[in-house]
């Protein structure tokens, strides 16, 4: 979908929202009583999406959003941690699921919204299976900010021009990388920009080699110095040495992602970035570009695996508009707002009543379901926060050639021992 079409779709959704208000004869009353909620997030370039949602919320319940973007994730987390103590900050905020949700919930950041989930599940607006990712103990603290797969995006026209097909095995994947490299194009996107992206290839290679190995590592059942983990690092090192990855300061969001795509570089990223191609880039999904599940390294594996990211939106526990915030979260899960979000984001949504329209997301979702692809939680949400945040710095140093495999695995193992012990002491008494 071209940018003009994407904007038109969002404007159309907003127009429908406005029309329904006029139809009820309640336009002036709705405007007069609109509650504005401060909404903090770290999703750079997403304000257009959140503004579209705001229009839907305003129509449905007379509540609108005032988005504030924090492009730096570290600054964002520090700001929210301070707001948790003072109550001076947003009404609604984006966060992360998994271990990060535990820290936020137990630290008093989030309000309990179990009642929101109870009603949404009863009305068929969301699956109960998703709820556990946002639970701490027997309480639920957030709703999904979309549920995104992490496939490999690729330039479909370049593949055709170069005589390439979607790889089904690791050998075929390596052959594709070598062929793209031979064309003078760097085949794979990798980055340490902002630190966090350094985990992308680490998690992917682990699940492609052995998803159980990944799950055991992220649940502290094995160490980073385990021979099987070291083997994955050696595979990664081999790919680095072949010159298959982009420079460490590469950005792969928005316009930069489009530039990479147009060159023919493949991009492993969450489907939340799909709109960068279909919106900003004006590319047509399924025609100009597409996505595939990365093949297994280990041919003995019977099924493929894909990383899944479940972002979170919650209400600040000490927020001044808590009742309105909870009401907004419930409305967010209903069909009208979810349909707007699906169109504005170009991604899938958690409400099963909303059909998947985007051809790339539709095709990927069908492939995952048909082939029973293992869906595995992202590394960023899969361990104690200090372990992950300090760990990505070590991984980044490895990617840049500043640490050997032995140094990297040894340092990660020591860090894991320290942070898992601290986590156990803090939360597992």
Show the residue positions of the predicted features:
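Extracytoplasmic/periplasmic solute-binding protein
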Residues: 137, 141-145, 150, 174-221, ...
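Conserved N-terminal structural module of periplasmic/extracytoplasmic solute-binding proteins
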Residues: 3-7, 11, 19, 23-102, ...
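A structural signal for short loop-to-beta-strand junctions that line the ligand-binding cleft
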Residues: 82-83, 90-91, 121-156, 186-189, ...
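Short, solvent-exposed loop/beta-turn-alpha elements that line the ligand-binding surface or hinge
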Residues: 112-126, 188, 192, 209-231, ...
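Hinge/lid segment of periplasmic solute-binding proteins
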Residues: 98-150, 174, 201, 291
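Glycine-centered hinge/linker elements that transmit conformational signals in sensory
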Residues: 219-249
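Conserved C-terminal helix/tail region of periplasmic/extracytoplasmic solute-binding proteins
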Residues: 35, 160, 372-429
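Extracytoplasmic/periplasmic substrate-recognition and gating elements
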Residues: 162, 242, 280-345
């Amino acid at each position: 979908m071209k940018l003009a079409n994407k904007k038109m779709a969002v404007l159309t959704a907003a127009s429908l929202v406005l029309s329904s208000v006029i139809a009820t004869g309640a336009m002036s009353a709705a405007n007069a009583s609109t509650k504005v909620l401060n909404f903090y997030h770290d999703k750079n370039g997403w304000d257009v999406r959140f503004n579209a949602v705001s229009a839907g919320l305003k129509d449905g319940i007379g509540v609108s959003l005032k988005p504030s973007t924090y492009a730096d994730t570290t600054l964002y987390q520090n700001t929210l941690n301070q707001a948790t103590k003072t109550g001076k900050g947003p009404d609604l905020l984006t966060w992360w699921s998994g271990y990060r949700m535990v820290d936020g919930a137990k630290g008093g950041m989030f309000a309990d919204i179990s009642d929101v989930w109870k009603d949404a599940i009863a009305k068929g607006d969301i699956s109960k299976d998703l709820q556990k990712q946002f639970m701490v103990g027997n309480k639920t603290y957030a709703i999904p900010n979309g549920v995104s797969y992490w496939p490999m995006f690729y330039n479909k026209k370049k593949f055709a021009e170069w005589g390439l097909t979607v790889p089904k095995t690791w050998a075929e994947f390596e052959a594709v990388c070598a062929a793209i490299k031979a064309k003078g194009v760097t085949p794979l996107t990798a980055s340490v920009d902002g630190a966090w992206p350094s985990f992308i290839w680490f998690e992917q290679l682990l699940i492609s080699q052995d998803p159980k190995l990944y799950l055991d590592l992220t649940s502290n059942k094995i160490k980073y110095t385990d021979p099987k983990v070291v083997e994955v690092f050696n595979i990664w090192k081999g790919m680095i040495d072949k010159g298959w990855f982009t420079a460490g300061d590469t950005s792969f969001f928005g316009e930069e992602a489009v530039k990479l795509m147009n060159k023919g570089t493949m991009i492993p990223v969450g489907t939340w970035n799909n709109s960068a191609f279909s919106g900003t880039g004006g590319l047509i999904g399924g025609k100009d570009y597409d996505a595939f599940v990365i093949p297994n390294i280990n041919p003995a594996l019977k099924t493929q695996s894909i990383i899944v990211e479940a972002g979170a939106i919650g209400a600040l526990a000490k927020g001044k508009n808590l009742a309105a915030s909870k009401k907004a979260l419930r409305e967010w899960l209903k069909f009208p707002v979810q349909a707007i979000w699906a169109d504005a984001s170009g991604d899938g949504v958690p409400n099963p009543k909303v059909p998947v329209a985007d051809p790339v997301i539709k095709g990927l979702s069908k492939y995952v379901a048909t082939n029973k692809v293992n869906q595995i939680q992202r590394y960023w949400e899969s361990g104690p926060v200090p372990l992950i945040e300090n760990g990505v710095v070590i991984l980044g140093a490895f990617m840049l050639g500043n640490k050997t495999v032995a140094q990297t695995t040894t340092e990660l193992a020591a860090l894991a021992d320290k942070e898992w012990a601290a986590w156990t002491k803090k939360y597992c008494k």
